[in-house]
Amino acid sequence: MDDTGPRQLTWRWRVLAAIIILAVRVLRWRIEVQGLEHVPARGGAVLAFNHHSYVDFMMVGWPIVRQRRRPMRFLAKREIWSSRKVGWVVRWAGAIPVDRGSDSAREAAFEAATQALQAGDLVAVAPEQTISPSFELLPLRTGAARMAQQAGVPIVPVAGWGSQRALTKGGTKRLIRKLPVTVRFGDAVHVGPDDDVVEVTEELTRRMTRLLHEVQDTYPDGAPPGARWVPARLGGGAPDHAEVLREHTERERGWTRSDPRSADSEDPGRPDGAAGPA
């Protein structure tokens, strides 16, 4: 691992940061950042965040760029590169494209992310791989643990809450003003060269779940009964998590049967914890 110093912000990252800061100020979003001290000031680290909105990576990157003065790379679906609206964002940010329909392409993305970590970059991944309709954690894949192990860097668990009220899959897609958003970074998970990545992922799941419950329980706007953006566990109107898990498992199995090349798709070891629209 190269820990000689943090990568510098390029002019493109500075422009992106300025745009994000302007948007947050115009919308008057109230972003509360907690536990940023857990993010290394130098050297590589995997930032594993929960995926519940289309702007998760921005909420994670906001404090990294603004307060840590470090750029952040992230994994995203290759389809985003062809988007007229946001394609330029992922290109400028140096994001790593993931083609989930090809084993070789997924491995190439995994290697690119590992090399970035070894070079001292921060790499953000969404181990759930897709947005969770229940706003509870879906099963995590082991890609984050594998990357961290191969690169010799820690995993920093991250939980965000609030942005799903504005921009999420199958829900509201409008920019709400004065929206409170909480982003909490937790204690790093360290991965030894001989550690079992499945066990590491189980520990990561426990930590991310704990962080998520903490930010949900302390959210400034509470948990209004029946609200679409509130988990059923808290009395909200989001889909039941058990049903979401069942449908998620069936969808994964169906995808595996339809694409024999992806026989490992039921194995959470696939290195494709892509962020971005799912």
Regions from the language model: what does each represent?
Residues R12-W13, I20-H51:
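Helix-to-loop junction immediately C-terminal to a conserved catalytic motif
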Residues W29-E32, A105-F110:
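Glycine-rich, highly charged phosphate/nucleotide-binding loops
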